[in-house]
Amino acid sequence: MAKFQAKSQNDAPDDGLKEKMIAINRVTKVVKGGRILGFAALTVVGDGDGRVGMGKGKSKEVPAAVQKAMEEARRNMTKVSLKNGTLHHNVFGHHGAANVMMAPAPKGTGIIAGGPMRAVFEVMGITDIVAKSHGSSNPYNMVRATMDALKNSTTASDIAAKRGKSVEEIFG
């Protein structure tokens, strides 16, 4: 029931961003008088054009935790350059024991990725990609590893500018 309440009470600002909830965990804090129950939420937010952010939120109630996570995700957005709905080149990322590999894919391939990575790609507007995760399947670490890999991606024009050459000289 709490998941449905989170959806109906979510007063998201109409800013055109796509939101996805990846995980909700029930957490407990043990105190002298017993246990205090709470909830932790992991969400991703994107504009469908290369901007994406992740957020975590904790609260005593599920809707409040999700709302906090969405707000944090909006504050922590990064821009990733896309090429025809996919990446420019293969990228690797890691966080903790989670390692991810992403490769660009031709048009019509779709999103071939598992779990939390798929949610990140959907909100940021990637339509064709092949991704694989190794090691930890913890959603928090997988999302952070995915974000790390996306931050490592560059364009040919970026590399050409760093080298002081033209894009044709880089490829030629």
Swiss-Prot record:
Domain S5 DRBM: 17-80
Annotated keywords: Ribonucleoprotein, Ribosomal protein, RNA-binding, rRNA-binding
A Gene Ontology term for the protein's cellular component: small ribosomal subunit
PROSITE patterns listed in its UniProt record: RIBOSOMAL_S5, S5_DSRBD
Domain notes: The N-terminal domain interacts with the head of the 30S subunit; the C-terminal domain interacts with the body and contacts protein S4. The interaction surface between S4 and S5 is involved in control of translational fidelity.
Entry similarity comment: Belongs to the universal ribosomal protein uS5 family.
Protein name: Small ribosomal subunit protein uS5
Record-level GO BP terms: translation
Oligomer status and interactors: Part of the 30S ribosomal subunit. Contacts proteins S4 and S8.
Its job: With S4 and S12 plays an important role in translational accuracy.
Gene3D superfamilies (alphabetical): 3.30.160.20, 3.30.230.10
Lineage start: Bacteria, Pseudomonadati, Pseudomonadota, Betaproteobacteria, Burkholderiales
One function term, GO molecular function aspect: rRNA binding
Database matches in PANTHER family: MITOCHONDRIAL RIBOSOMAL PROTEIN S5
